[in-house]
Design a protein with these regions (language model features):
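Acyl-donor (CoA/ACP) binding surface of acyl/acetyltransferases
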Residues: 89, 93, 137-138, 146-148, ...
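Conserved acetyl-CoA-binding loop-helix of GNAT-fold acetyltransferases
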Residues: 82, 88-101, 120, 124-128
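Conserved catalytic-core motifs of GNAT/GCN5-like acyltransferases
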Residues: 112-115, 127, 132-148
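Conserved hydrophobic/aromatic "anchor" residues
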Residues: 31, 64, 86, 125, ...
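Acetyl-CoA-dependent GNAT
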Residues: 4-85, 96-98, 102, 106, ...
Length: 158
């Protein structure tokens, strides 16, 4: 594997089992149990219109972005996660840029996502890449946790 390069996860890849295992570890560590896709991960990846990009560095998966395109016009970033020790090194931005590029090749008109307003580094990253806050969705994650719904239109320069 190339160091620090964003790679698309493919089931046919020899690295598939190792990458999935590492992504699952990241998922369980970063996201609360009720937000984790760990139980439905294979189901999510098995969907026809979904993808996962990951970044490999220092002999491990440093982070990943998962997305889907439920229609020909809309894509949804479902997860973006970077291991704590690899944060603030540009990996999250590289993953997000790669996902945006992938969506644009499919002529997606809008990319949306949800983010906890208290996760200001994530909110700032999304804003840096042109995402705009559409609305506040109350009780999105839990009774006491809201989310910003954010979007990026395809005509935005990234």
């Amino acid at each position: 594997m190339d160091e620090g390069v964003v790679v698309e996860l493919k089931k046919s890849s020899a690295d598939y089992p190792m990458v999935v295992e590492e992504v699952m570890r990241i998922e369980k560590k970063i996201f609360p149990k009720h937000e984790s896709l760990s139980r439905s991960f294979d189901e999510e990846l098995g969907k026809k219109n979904s993808g996962l990009l990951y970044i490999y560095t220092s002999g491990e998966v440093a982070g990943y972005v998962m997305f889907s395109w439920p229609s020909s016009l809309l894509a949804v970033i479902t997860k973006l996660a970077v291991k704590e020790k690899h944060r603030r090194q540009g990996y999250g931005e590289a993953l997000l840029r790669a996902a945006i590029k992938k969506c644009k090749t499919r002529n997606i008109q809008r990319i949306s996502l949800h983010v906890d307003p208290s996760r200001s580094p994530a909110v700032n990253l999304y804003k840096k890449l042109g995402f705009r806050i559409d609305s506040l969705v109350e009780k999105y994650y839990a009774a006491d946790r809201d989310a910003y719904r954010m979007y990026l239109d395809s005509d935005a320069d990234v």
